[in-house]
């Protein structure tokens, strides 16, 4: 067993996020594990850029309301205690509603060292029109 000291909170880079986003690395995976886990906090209206993960991603909402959008125009609302999974290669974005902070636990796997592909591929920023699309509550 090993106790891991917390790292300093990081600010989300502008290339990857619109608005103010802060994250704490909870787990960065040590071989053979490739598990990654971050606690991510979004200011009202903040969101990721479009991106996808080679091995998929799971988002567990802790506080606020999360918005998760996909290329087909779907924007899901997820509330505290709810979990959303994004399959490998699915282009998506996630963020907070315009009027509240949102916090989620983001879980994903890194790629194998000999795989040659990035674990996350970052794309263009989400437009206001995409962000403001009608939302769906899925139960």
For the regions a protein language model found, what residue spans apply to each?
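Short, conserved beta-strand element in jelly-roll/cupin
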Residues: 39-43, 52-68, 107-110
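Short beta-strand His + acidic residue motifs that chelate non-heme Fe in jelly-roll/DSBH
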Residues: 48-50, 68-69, 86, 91-98
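A short, N-terminal "cap"/entry segment at the start of jelly-roll beta-barrel domains
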Residues: 1-34, 119-139
